[in-house]
Swiss-Prot record:
Cellular component terms (Gene Ontology): cytoplasm
Top-level taxon: Bacteria
Entry's Gene Ontology molecular function annotations: rRNA (pseudouridine-N3-)-methyltransferase activity
Class of enzymatic activity (EC top level): transferase
Binding sites annotated in the UniProt record for S-adenosyl-L-methionine: L74, G101, L120, G121, N122, I123, T124, M125
Protein known as: Ribosomal RNA large subunit methyltransferase H
Keyword set includes Methyltransferase: yes
Entry-linked Gene3D superfamilies: 3.40.1280.10
Keyword NADP assigned: no
Pfam families referenced in this protein's UniProt entry, alphabetically: SPOUT_MTase
Reactions mediated catalytically: pseudouridine(1915) in 23S rRNA + S-adenosyl-L-methionine = N(3)-methylpseudouridine(1915) in 23S rRNA + S-adenosyl-L-homocysteine + H(+)
Length: 152
């Protein structure tokens, strides 16, 4: 299985990088995983214009990546699911892509392209923390599917 985590983010070092690296290593026993951070001058410019312009810039940046996979969009208004339901998102898939939006979320048109729209909870968190939570849930999901004791 191939997993891609795509996020709107500047490529910069973070205190969360070692944890993301460790979780990715744990996941690599089950699947190939790739972390893709996207950001360009159009996003920078859009941030100075309006939230709507920002959402449009995010959609354009993500658009080429919404192909040939099961696309999961993380969104505050998405479905709240538990770890067992999350594991079903991974079960039997060849490729799964997770999309973490920027500060202004997603355009409605982009949300329609998702195969599943989920929420990590009702609290607001930075995309860096959302990525850590997502990675942990991916590992937990594979642990559930393979009856690994990590989940207990």
């Amino acid at each position: 299985m191939n997993i891609e985590i795509l996020s709107i983010a500047k490529k910069e070092r973070s205190i969360y990088d070692p944890l993301c690296k460790e979780l990715s290593k744990m996941i690599s026993r089950f699947a190939k995983i790739e972390d893709i951070e996207l950001f360009n001058k159009d996003v920078t410019k859009a941030h100075t214009i309006s939230p709507e312009a920002s959402r449009e810039a995010y959609s354009k940046l993500f658009a080429p990546h919404v192909v040939k996979s099961f696309n999961v969009i993380l969104h505050p208004d998405g479905k709240l699911i538990d770890s067992y339901e999350f594991s079903k998102l991974l079960d039997g898939k060849i490729a799964v892509k997770f999309f973490i939006g920027g500060a202004y979320g997603f355009e409605d048109e982009f949300l329609k392209k998702g195969d599943s729209i989920i929420s990590l909870g009702n609290i607001t968190m930075s995309h860096k923390i959302a990525k850590v939570v997502l990675l942990e849930q991916i590992y937990r999901g594979f642990s559930i599917l393979s009856n690994h004791p990590y989940h207990k």
